[in-house]
Amino acid sequence: MDSRTGEPITARQAMNGEYIWRVPNPLYFKIIKHHKRPFNYNHDIIQVRIQFNHNLRRALAIHKCFLDFTVFTRLQPATWRFLRVFKTQVMKYLDSLGVISINNVIRSVDHVLYNVLDSTFDVIEDHDIKFNFY
């Protein structure tokens, strides 16, 4: 849903893409929180944010795009190592597709968390997307 207007994102907006080789460094990756074994649970909670950079947002007619993923995993990775592996694998998957769009980024995250990394048992996705009016 577009957080500015409250209207649902159309399939055309979600699939609108740009060739990955035309946009240098298209995504920013950040770890927002990393809870290590909270409340003596047997899993870690890692919150990752993916931001679209300026050139990609301009190509896709997006004002703002933050994709937040809360990952519940039984792994006990160091924060920097998880971010490095996650970023590398997401970019490798997007390179193999050749086109970067909102749907392809979400599809690549799903592939990395469930097929590449072991012991991921739940992911909660949240987003803040605003499209340009003009």
UniProtKB/Swiss-Prot annotation:
Coiled coil: none annotated. One of its GO terms (biological process) is viral process. It comes from the Viruses. InterPro entries: Gemini_AL3. Pfam families: Gemini_AL3 (PF01407). Keywords: Host-virus interaction. Increases viral DNA accumulation. Enhances infectivity and symptom expression. Belongs to the geminiviridae replication enhancer protein family. Homooligomer. Interacts with the replication-associated protein (REP). Interacts with host proliferating cell nuclear antigen (PCNA). Interacts with host retinoblastoma-related protein 1 (RBR1), and may thereby deregulate the host cell cycle. Oligomerization and interaction with PCNA are necessary for optimal replication enhancement. This is Replication enhancer protein. The lineage of its organism: Viruses, Monodnaviria, Shotokuvirae, Cressdnaviricota, Repensiviricetes.
